[in-house]
UniProtKB/Swiss-Prot annotation:
Annotated stretches, region: G1: 383-390
Name of the featured protein: Translation initiation factor IF-2
Stored SUPFAM superfamilies: Initiation factor IF2/eIF5b, domain 3 (SSF52156), P-loop containing nucleoside triphosphate hydrolases (SSF52540), Translation proteins (SSF50447)
Keyword GTP-binding: yes
Gene Ontology cellular-component terms listed: cytosol
Family listed: Belongs to the TRAFAC class translation factor GTPase superfamily. Classic translation factor GTPase family. IF-2 subfamily.
Naturally occurring in which organism (per UniProt): Sulfurimonas denitrificans (strain ATCC 33889 / DSM 1251)
Gene from which this protein is expressed: infB
Length: 874
């Protein structure tokens, strides 16, 4: 199958827009519809030559067509020897005034009048020259695409014409003898003798390393060119080209007789027969080529910028130093530095977004044409936790979803499709718990109408306010469902007033928002709500093109046993079929199965319908866009580009830091950290829990999620926790198996599993509070004034009178002199006359001895107090 090249790849290679390439192609007669269209390698080569040179390729003349046509091997064909002679004669005439004449004369040294086999040897040498030239051209075309645009000096057209004539003549000669057998031993021996004579006359040369390759001992098809190793560039200046052509062609190498090198390993087949030539010109790398335009990403280091400009790093750093910028090669360049460097080096710099390389959503965007059909509306039910969102959906679907939810709260996004009056409606049920704000955000991204459920007896709550904010930002129509109207304490006017304060004015108050009283428990108002949904959808005129390539949004993803990575998607445009190749962020695959909300396998899903997709290579992130591709190769390329971008971004951020970042990193190092390994059943829960855990922190403690993933708890997770200090293993809606439990017991690892998210967060909060340093408050118990001092064998005794409260033995004490604290310590001895007492009340005299302190003088005030530990909180 002929290899294809996309138009936007040609545009990127040449540094121009895809629109210009399409225009040039139309001038050449090549029909191209868009930047994603493909052309053959021959058309791409001709198009690139036309854009670079500005001249259309000339059509071959009748004489050239006759000369380049390969003769068919029939009994009436002319003798191959005569045909070869004609080719060589024509070649000599054409190149009589150029350095190529030397090559042809060398090829004529073998007598071809009487030996048909010698002709084959001669043409084989010519073929060898041709292969070297063609491999050089191919190597030039295979320069790695890295955003660097190289401008080469344009060569005279006369030399290019001579080179093309030379190659076509050699191809003609090769074709004329392609059906003949191998060269005889006599000719082989003669060539070997000539080589030895030449080596003897030219003196001792540097010994070649490795084993010589016998190219005559195998058929022509067994000798292949190693294009990956070939580095000779054909696009040289005039002087270099003449030197290259005038170089004497090397003669065929023969295998040396067995000797001291006989035990060396033989060279593998398929090695490059022109390796010597490659070594000779290996220094001709494109280091001195002029760079006039370069495309760079927004985040680029100094050494990366130098590589793009094909300049030494020292030159770039020297310019930066001259500007007073002390930067190293690993520092990132800002927009100002890039602008200055581009002016200094005379290079036009274009800042490109690396996301464009894998922006398949924009590349494959389908325009919804006038033939698009009506699609069902997508409704997202949102509101505060326990306000009855899932119960409302139960009443609509006549199912009991709430009974299956742990703790009676929704912890996943549910997607369902129902029919009302013959029209389909798709519902998304989002969680109302505070931890699931990202899930609610994804719900607004794919919805057409938002239903905000508010309990009539509870009013507006924090998550209700968040939903109102999301609805205003997304500019999606809103319908307010006032639930729990069957309760005696229901107050719909209170709900309307609170919502009006936040910008959602009811229609009966002169606003534009429908407020519908309902009761999910009794079913009151459900039909009226559905009628309003259909009426609003009719006004929106929702349409989609069912015949387009499928585009779907991932609302949930997980790793299921027996199915692997799965994703719940809602189709936004086109039709997704079983067998389609899809890409979704950094994951890709082929749709093996589609499962609807009733656990039934279906063959396809149309716009605004939902299903579970099976067949991806890894669990995609929730909120990603899934697109259908024409081939597995195309899907894989987009996914790998996205993976490389994510990896590069992560590595860049790990080293990109400012002074403020360094200060915060030092502060982070002083925090006490609780390491967590987290495993959940679905990606949405993983995202919500990980985000909530990262918010559980203060200036003293924090949580560090060192590993997280979707799926069951494995032995690797247990090993990771056992090898980490101060680490816990958490599982949400997953349970460890027998072998994992045994390993955890052996490693003394405690596995904590949960099914309700707020229980997990409460436990983690308690663990963090236990890691915090205790806080104490002081309670003053009394004061005494020193009236006299006495020396005792164990220390100084202060005779005191209690003037406030009471003194307590064993408590803490501080000595105050002239209003200044001079010592804090412990009261070790308290006596009333000669008796030891535990405490002395107000107005009584006593003897006091302070541990380790004898510098008490008359007039000091001794104050006793105790510290009470306070409960800490985040």
């Amino acid at each position: 199958m002929t290899e294809k090249v996309r138009v936007h790849e040609i545009a990127k290679e040449l540094g121009i827009t895809s629109k210009d390439v399409v225009k040039k192609a139309s001038d050449m007669g090549i029909e191209i519809k868009s930047a994603n269209s493909s052309v053959s390698m021959e058309e791409a080569e001709g198009l690139m030559n036309y854009i670079m040179s500005g001249e259309l390729a000339q059509s071959p003349t009748a004489e050239q067509k006759v000369q380049t046509k390969a003769p068919s091997h029939t009994p009436k064909e002319e003798d191959p020897t005569q045909e070869s002679n004609k080719s060589q004669t024509t070649l000599s005439k054409k190149a009589s005034e150029t350095p190529i004449q030397h090559v042809v004369e060398k090829a004529k040294e073998i007598d071809v009048k009487n030996s048909e086999k010698e002709v084959i040897s001669e043409v084989k040498e010519i073929k060898k020259e041709e292969e070297s030239i063609e491999s050089s051209e191919l190597k030039k075309m295979q320069i790695k695409k890295s955003g660097l645009k190289i401008v080469k000096k344009k060569q005279p057209r006369e030399e290019e014409k001579i080179q093309d004539d030379f190659i076509s003549s050699v191809k003609q000669t090769q074709a004329s003898i392609s059906s003949y057998g191998k060269i005889s031993a006599e000719v082989l021996e003669e060539l070997a003798n000539k080589k030895k004579a030449k080596q003897a006359s030219s003196g001792a040369k540097k010994q070649e390393q490795g084993v010589k390759i016998d190219i005559f001992g195998a058929s022509l098809s067994e000798v292949s060119m190693d294009m990956d190793d070939q580095i000779v560039l054909l696009d040289l200046n005039s002087t270099q080209r003449q030197e290259l052509i005038a170089e004497e062609p090397r003669k065929p190498k023969v295998v040396k007789p067995a000797g001291r090198n006989a035990n060396k390993k033989s060279a593998p087949k398929g090695r490059n027969v022109s390796r010597d030539k490659r070594k000779k010109y290996a220094k001709d790398k494109p280091e001195d080529l002029i760079v006039t335009h370069v495309e760079i990403p927004e985040d680029i280091r100094v050494y990366e910028f130098a590589e793009k400009l094909n300049r030494p790093i020292s030159d770039v750093i020297k310019v930066l130093f001259s500007l007073g910028l002390m930067m190293t090669k690993n520092d990132f360049l800002g927009s100002d530095e890039i602008e200055i460097l581009s002016e200094e080096f005379g290079v036009e710099v274009t800042i490109v977004d690396p996301k464009d390389a894998f922006n398949y959503e924009e590349d494959l965007a389908e325009v919804i044409d006038e033939n698009a059909t009506e699609r069902p509306p997508v409704i997202t039910i949102m509101g505060h936790v326990d306000h009855g969102k899932t119960s409302l959906l139960d009443a609509i679907r006549k199912a009991k979803v709430t009974q299956d939810e742990a703790g009676g709260i929704t912890q996943h996004i549910g997607a369902y499709t129902i029919e009302q009056n013959g029209k389909a409606i798709t519902f998304l049920d989002t969680p109302g718990h505070a931890a699931f704000s990202q899930m609610r955000q994804r719900g607004t991204d794919v919805t057409d109408i938002i239903i905000i459920v508010v309990a009539a007896d509870d009013g507006v709550k924090p998550q209700t306010e968040e939903v109102i904010k999301l609805a205003k930002e997304s500019k999606v129509p809103v319908i307010v469902a006032v639930n729990k109207m069957d309760k005696p304490t229901a107050n719909p006017d209170m709900v309307k007033a609170q919502m009006a304060e936040r910008g959602l004015n009811p229609i009966d108050w002169g606003g534009d928002i429908e407020f519908i009283p309902i009761s999910a428990k009794s079913g009151m108002g459900i039909d009226e709500l559905l009628e309003n949904i259909l009426l609003t959808a009719e006004v929106l005129e929702l349409k989609a093109n069912e015949n387009a390539m499928a585009k779907a949004a991932v609302v949930e993803s997980s790793l299921e046993k027996g199915r692997g990575p799965v994703a719940t998607v809602i189709v936004q445009n086109g039709t997704l079929n079983v067998g389609d190749y899809v890409v979704c962020g950094s994951s890709y695959g082929r749709v093996k199965a589609l499962i609807n909300e009733h656990k039934q396998q279906i063959k396809s899903i149309k716009p605004s319908h939902t299903a579970v997709v099976v067949g991806l290579n890894e669990v995609p992130s929730s909120g990603e866009i899934m697109m259908a591709m024409s081939s597995d190769k195309e899907a894989r390329e987009y996914a790998l580009k996205r993976h490389e971008y994510d990896r590069h971004k992560e590595l860049s951020h790990s080293t990109k830091s400012t002074l403020e970042d360094m200060t915060s990193m030092i502060a982070e190092g002083r925090l006490k950290s609780l390491k967590v390994v987290l495993k959940t059943d679905v990606h949405g829960s993983l995202e919500a829990i990980r985000s909530s855990l990262n918010e559980l922190r203060n200036d003293e403690v924090k949580i560090n999620v060192i590993s997280s993933g979707v799926g069951g708890i494995t032995e690797n997770d247990v090993e990771l926790v056992s090898n980490s200090e101060n680490c816990v293993l958490l599982g949400f809606n997953v349970r460890p198996t027998g072998s994992v439990k045994a390993l955890a017991k052996q490693k003394n690892v405690d596995i904590k599993t949960y099914s309700i998210i707020y229980q997990l967060l409460d436990d983690m909060t308690g663990m963090l509070m236990g890691m915090m340093a205790p806080k104490f408050s002081e309670i003053n118990t009394g004061q005494a004034e020193v009236r006299n001092t006495f020396k005792a064998p164990k220390g100084m005794v202060a005779g005191c009178v209690v003037v406030d409260g009471k003194l307590i033995r064993g408590g803490l004490v501080r000595v105050i002199r002239d209003g200044v604290v001079v010592h804090e310590g412990e009261l070790t001895s308290l006596k009333r006359f000669k008796d030891d007492v535990d405490e002395i009340g107000n107005g009584y005299e006593c003897g006091v001895m302070i541990k380790g302190y004898d510098d008490v003088i008359v007039g000091d005030v001794i104050e006793t107090f105790k510290k009470v530990e306070q409960k800490v909180s985040l």
